Amino acid sequence: MIERYLARVGLDGGDHSLAELQRAHVQSISYENLDIHLGREIRLDVDSLVDKMIDRRRGGYCYEQNTLYAAALEALGFTVTRCLGRVRLSDAVSPRPATHMALLVDGLLVDVGFGAANPLGPVPLGGEATYGPYTWRTERTVSPEGEQVWMVRLFDMPLYTFTETPHHPIDYLTPNHFSSTHPLSLFTQMTIVQRWDDGDVQVGLVGLGLTERLPDGEVKTTSVDPGDLGDLLRGRFGLELDDDEVDRLARFNAQQQSAAPARS
C-alpha cells in the first residue's frame, strides 16, 4: 500500500519528513463529499479507502483523509494518535457535535482532513507554524462545552477544537454515519470540494460557487455553469469521475441552485 500511496501524492520511495508528507497529501488528494450525493456509503476501512482514494483517484472528507493518512504514516514507522474535535468555523462559541477527526504525531498536529483551511504542514501543540504566507497555531483553552481543549487557528480565525484523548477506528463509525446521512449535517445538504492548489492558493467549490483565496489575500468568486462541472472537478481538483457521475452531480447542484431563495 505505501508505495501506491507515495505515488498518489507524488513522492518517491525514499525517506520523507512529516512536513513533506503533509504538504504532498493536501496538494494531491482533494477534500470532497461527492459520494454522499451519489448515494454511496462512506466506508472507513483502509482497503476501501485505498481503492477509492489511491486506485480510483478520488478524494474524501476528514474521516477518509485522516484514516488513510494515519495508515500511511504508521506504515512509514510513525506513531499516530487519532483524536476527535468540534468544528468552530462559523461560530466559535456555539456547542457543536464532536465530528472532526484529527491526528497527532509526537506532539505535532498532522491533520490532512480540514479542506482548504487545512495546515500545509505539522503544527506544534502550544505553538505555531508558518507555511508560505499562512500561519496556523494551537492554543490551550476551555471550550463552551467545558472541556480543556486545543484550539486550532488559521491566523486569528478559529477552525476547530480537539482533545488529546486517543480514539480508535471504531470510534469514528457513529460520527461518520451522522455526517454522511443525517439531514442536519452540512455534508448532506451540499456538495463540497476543496484543495490547496499550486502556489498555495485555497480553492473551494461549494455547490456551483467557486472561491479562490490567493496568498496576497485577494478572493475571487465565480458561479460555475452545470455544464462545466465535469471539467472543473477533473481538471482543477484532479478527481476521476465518469460522465454519469458528473451528470448526477450537475443535476443535484442545478436543483439546489434553483431552489435557493433569490437574493435582493
Language-model region placement:
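Generic structural "secondary-structure junction" signal
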Residues: 28-38, 46, 51-56, 125-127, ...
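Secondary-structure boundary elements
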Residues: 1-57
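Hydrophobic/aromatic-rich core segments of domains that either
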Residues: 67, 71-138
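N-terminal accessory/pre-domain segments preceding catalytic cores
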Residues: 1-15, 19, 75-76, 143-264
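Short loop/turn segments at secondary-structure transitions that flank enzyme active sites
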Residues: 37, 116, 199
